[in-house]
Amino acid sequence: EEALEIVGSKDLKGRNLGSLSGGELQRVMLANALYPLPELLLLDEPVSGVDAAGSEKFYEVIRDLKQNYHMAIAMVSHDLGIVRDFADKVVLINKSVLKSGKAEDVFNSQEFKSSFYSLDEGEEKQ
């Protein structure tokens, strides 16, 4: 119950999992991962398949965990906007670590540009 309260979903207690929206389900799963409260939380594409409103609420919870519980959070994400907004440190990986540092430094690096854009044509790689 305390973990559901931490993620702002105390009202979901007792609800059937099948009746929850994608965002609600993600917050319930996050609450499950928070009991007992860990020092490190690992997340892999945590809002995949969740609508924009659910994603926003989920990341508000993540921000709260980081600020109020001083929790270390390692997250895999391909959403560069989320990475820019939430990450203290970014690690760019493509078979190996290509670059790490602050989001702005990584996003402006040649390694980043080479990973996402064809240097000849200036087009995004598929």
Regions found by a protein language model. Give the residues of each.
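Conserved beta-strand-loop-alpha-helix hinge in the C-terminal portion
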Residues: S96-S118
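Conserved catalytic motifs of ABC-family nucleotide-binding domains
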Residues: L37
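Conserved ABC ATPase "signature" region
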Residues: E1-L12
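A short, surface-exposed alpha-helical micro-motif characterized by mixed small hydrophobic
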Residues: V83-D85
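Conserved ABC ATPase signature
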Residues: N16-L20, E24
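Catalytic Walker B motif of ABC-type/P-loop ATPase nucleotide-binding domains
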Residues: L41-D44
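H-loop/switch region of ABC-family ATPase nucleotide-binding domains
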Residues: S77-H78
